[in-house]
Amino acid sequence: MSIHSFHLMQAPVREAVGALLRPPSASGLHHVEVLVGMQLGAPVVSPRRMQLRHLAVFAEWADEAALDDFLAQRPFGRRLAGGWHVRLEFLRRWGTIRELAHLPAEAGRTDPGEPIVAVTLARMRLPEVPRFIRWGRPVERQVRDHPETTLALAAMRPLRTVSTFSVWTSARAMTGMVFGRDGGDPARLHREAMVERDRRDFHHEFTTLRFRPLSEHGSWDGRSNIIP
């Protein structure tokens, strides 16, 4: 059975740029996105906005054995193994990215009380980037500061690819944020941004993926046990 994984690692700038320009390939690796880290909600002109020493890698594998082999036998895989990663069971997809269009709209049921990992992936329309930043940054801060996220970050690959990754204590908490059921003024932020996106899309392609976390490995920024 295929699985997905999301990895975080620190790397020298030269190695990070090399991985962006030449993403890894391996037997059993169906798709990979190599991105540099961004802090959600950070100012546009800021070293926190594009963190070249922080790599994020999102991948789809034929099975868990293919991932284990890559982490043990490939130089880049061994570097990834020294960071943090979570192994993921795919549950649902909204929207479409060409490389992931084979994923069904729904592959499994979600218990509202179980921990959930959400990944978004977008190919930007470059003229729409200023609008995207204007409407997106408040939502970034909302997700980053939400009491029910244990980790929330963004990543990008110049010039068009943007991704977010968030770990939620429950599916109920995540959908409450998405549909504006949280209390107070922040509740409207995500809903209003979606209305603006529907008015004129920011993206050529966009997908939101929901996963069940299977296992967590390593540590990131001094933290482990990030999955509730």
Go through the PLM ranges and name each one.
Residues 74:
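Catalytic-core segment of enzymes that process non-peptidic bonds
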Residues 1-55, 62-70, 81-158, 173-184, ...:
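Short S/T/G/P-rich N-terminal loop/turn motif that feeds into the first structured element of a domain
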Residues 155-156, 163-166:
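Alpha-helical membrane segments in multi-pass integral membrane proteins
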Residues 57-59, 164:
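Generic transmembrane alpha-helix motif of multi-pass integral membrane proteins
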Residues 185, 189-196:
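Aromatic sugar-binding interfaces of carbohydrate-active proteins
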